[in-house]
């Protein structure tokens, strides 16, 4: 019987944080620690926090306070530990350790020191670490899906973004390392991997001297995983070579997540993305011409300091004109330590909320129309869940990425983690409904 303490985990934030959590769990399990989903039964709770914007920090703080009030011993990991180490130690006596974004591979040593009674701060000022295929990992996603981090950190300095401070400079894994990990996941039965980094299209610059995303996609084309999806493709990095690699590699989904942030050149200049304003329309046109079946997701920030009604109207028309498949809209969050924090002409929250709502309503109409086109079509669906009450299956098609896009509700019988043909019979703004064509899956 194990004499090691039991540890529970709470994960907050993005899928990059999720991968960090999975490595933390993997390392602790390898070292003999017990992991329990029940925080009440655990000796320690590791909270992997998010600090990207104010709302994320508030969620992280709420979670930490609730655990502190329950007298839990807390290990704070992730972006808040990186961002506010001294404040957290001062204000939360229950925090017995802090682990920064570049230090989670030291978690076993941290826990051993904690067990001896130490209060530990393991936070490297500028993170440089990136896990690879040799780092233990315990996946927390559904059995058919896995995220694969191809790079970490960011060298861009967008005026609104705190990520370079939280995650460090850009650093990539080798193509060989990523392919080995993908093959391991294929051997485990994974059907979809999602490639992530801060800027996926900049992959490889630091180790190869030039972007190597196209070469990576071609190499991953030899791995037996049916769906490979990319997130965070910076628009100017979608070169003809990358687009050709997507076209020519059958298991690379024509799904592009483009964090455009805005459409108006003046706002993009203020955001320190000056080159983007002149190319947004051209890049989208090039993608749609080369890949008429491409699924486009993007995200925008409304209410950036100085954004006028004219700037906002430009963005609304941009959304109408391009008819994106999926859109996320965020109100500007002033982040201390970023250039945008002290910019003049900050907008009231109610103005930002109204602008966000307007774009969301425009996009909802577009999304509804896009989904209606799929009624009567046969699509491949990766089955991920089963509703225990109704027996209804829940999954996604290539046009839906996990967490951020819609779902497909399926009538029929199939194994979890397999891809099956589904006839779409109905659709709403975000989700699709259908019937399994064959129950032989």
UniProtKB/Swiss-Prot annotation:
InterPro entries per UniProt: Elp3/MiaA/NifB-like_rSAM, Methylthiotransferase, Methylthiotransferase_CS, Methylthiotransferase_N, Methylthiotransferase_N_sf, NA-bd_OB-fold, Ribosomal_uS12_MeSTrfase_RimO, rSAM
GO annotations of cellular component type: cytosol
Localisation per UniProt entry: Cytoplasm
Enzyme nomenclature, EC number: 2.8.4.4
Chief place where the protein resides: cytoplasm
Family annotation (CDD domains): Radical_SAM
EC class name: transferase
Keyword Ubl conjugation listed: no
CC cofactor: [4Fe-4S] cluster
Every TRAM domain range: 372-438
Residue intervals of the Radical SAM core domain: 140-370
All residue ranges annotated as the MTTase N-terminal domain in the record: 5-116
SMART domains per record: Elp3
The protein's name: Ribosomal protein uS12 methylthiotransferase RimO
Native source species: Trichodesmium erythraeum (strain IMS101)
């Amino acid at each position: 019987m194990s004499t090691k303490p039991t540890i529970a985990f709470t994960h907050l934030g993005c899928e990059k944080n999720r991968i960090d959590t999975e490595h933390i769990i993997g390392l602790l399990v390898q070292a003999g620690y017990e992991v329990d989903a029940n925080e009440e039964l655990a000796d320690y709770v590791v909270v992997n926090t998010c600090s990207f914007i104010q709302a994320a920090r508030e969620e992280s703080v709420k979670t930490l306070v609730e655990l502190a009030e329950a007298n839990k011993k807390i290990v704070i990991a992730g972006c808040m530990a990186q961002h506010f180490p001294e404040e957290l130690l001062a204000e939360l006596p229950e925090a017995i350790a802090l682990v920064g974004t570049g230090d989670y591979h030291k978690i076993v040593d941290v826990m051993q020191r904690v067990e001896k009674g130490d209060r530990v701060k393991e936070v490297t000022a500028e993170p440089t670490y990136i896990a690879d295929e040799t780092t233990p990992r315990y996946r927390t996603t559904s059995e058919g899906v896995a995220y694969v981090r191809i790079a970490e950190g960011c060298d861009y300095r967008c005026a609104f973004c705190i990520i370079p401070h939280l995650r460090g400079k850009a650093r990539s894994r080798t193509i060989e390392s990523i392919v080995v990990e993908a093959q391991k996941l294929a051997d485990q039965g994974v059907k979809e991997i999602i490639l992530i980094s801060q800027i996926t299209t900049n992959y490889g610059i630091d180790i190869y001297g030039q972007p190597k995303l196209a070469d990576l996609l071609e190499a991953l084309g030899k791995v037996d995983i049916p769906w490979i999806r990319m997130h965070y493709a910076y628009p100017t990095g979608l070169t003809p070579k990358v687009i050709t690699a997507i076209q020519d590699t059958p298991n690379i989904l024509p799904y592009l997540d483009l964090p455009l942030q805005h459409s108006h050149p003046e706002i993009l200049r203020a955001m320190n993305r000056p080159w983007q304003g002149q190319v947004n329309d051209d890049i989208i046109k090039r993608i749609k011409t080369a890949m008429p079946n491409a699924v486009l997701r993007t995200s925008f920030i409304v209410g950036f300091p100085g954004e006028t009604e004219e700037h906002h109207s430009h963005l609304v028309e941009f959304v109408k004109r391009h008819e994106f498949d999926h859109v996320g809209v965020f109100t500007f969050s002033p982040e201390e330590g970023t250039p945008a924090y002290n910019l003049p002409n900050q907008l009231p929250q109610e103005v930002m909320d109204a602008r966000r709502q307007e774009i969301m309503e425009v996009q909802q109409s577009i999304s509804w129309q896009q989904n209606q086109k799929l009624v009567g079509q046969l699509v491949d669906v990766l089955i991920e869940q089963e509703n225990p009450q109704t027996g209804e299956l829940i999954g996604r098609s290539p046009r839906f990425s996990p967490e951020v896009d819609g779902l497909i509700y399926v009538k029929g019988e199939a194994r979890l983690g397999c891809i099956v043909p589904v006839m779409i019979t109905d659709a709403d703004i975000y989700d699709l409904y259908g019937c399994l064509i064959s129950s032989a899956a």
